[in-house]
Amino acid sequence: SSVKDKLNPFHLAIPVSNLEESVAYYKDTLGLREGRSSNKWADFDFFGHQLVCHVSDSINEQITNAVDGEKVPVPHFGVVLSIEEFEEFLSQINDKNVDFIIKPTIRFKGEIGEQRTMFFKDPSGNAIEIKAFKDIGNLFSS
């Protein structure tokens, strides 16, 4: 069985400075389906996982760590897609003025963990990574 067959939906709540702006970004820019919401939070179907944006006066500071020659933002969250899903998502956001931190690239080329990856920020500065392994079976391989 594949990794995807074993997964339960993950829940992640993130701070946002402006809920209306965040809802527009996650729906219109990233194409996510909005679920329930109030005037303080909104949840989204993030590739089968529950992402909740909560209004907050305090947004976390970020650092970067070097990974395969790139400055990767910490903290960040994201999803592992198939190569086909990665390409489809990339084509969906291609003309949406996404604020890339790391433009779509191949990381660890020729190694066990070879993957397509991209990093971008939402309007509140939350860093998001979308990636796809050349071989999903190597997700946890070293």
List the model feature ranges, each with a label.
Residues 18-19, 82-85:
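Helix N-cap motif at beta-to-alpha junctions
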Residues 1-8, 33-83, 90-121, 133-142:
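Vicinal oxygen chelate
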Residues 127-130:
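Short glycine-/small-residue motifs
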Residues 22-27, 93, 125:
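Conserved active-site tyrosine of GNAT-family acetyltransferases
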